[in-house]
Amino acid sequence: MYTGEADWSLIGEVKNNPRIHIPIIGNGDITTPEEAKLAFERYGVDAVMIGRATFGRPWIFEEIRDYLDNTGATPLTVDEKIDLLEEQLRINVERIDEYRGILHTRRHLAASPIFKGIPDFRQTRIAMLRATTVEELTGILKECRERIKAIE
């Protein structure tokens, strides 16, 4: 889907240009808290923008904040992560409408790394991508929650 890597050296050059006096926001290939910290330290950016790494992982912002603040926060549980995915679904449906909210959300849910390790997940992922109602998607998420707990 996406090829190549972000060229952060160009972002660093812009940030270190003495003629530029605006906040510089770095974007590209930030998928972990460690990568966000490296962007701040190595390139001096004022902020980072997170893109694809948010797909099915809306908690990444909290993970990055806790890591940068060195809070030693406890990682979210599976239940908390699935609760966030359900909240994301609810917000998208309320913000748009059920049909388009589900179209937007279901691909993010299917891409969530939380489901890695679930045996024979392919059919469940296909069901997520074909779901047309909130009830279908929340039912699938409930099933996933139970399956994850069974393998922990």
What would you call each of these model-derived segments?
Residues Y2, S9-G26, I30-E152:
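Alpha/beta catalytic cores of nucleotide-metabolism and tRNA/nucleoside-modifying enzymes
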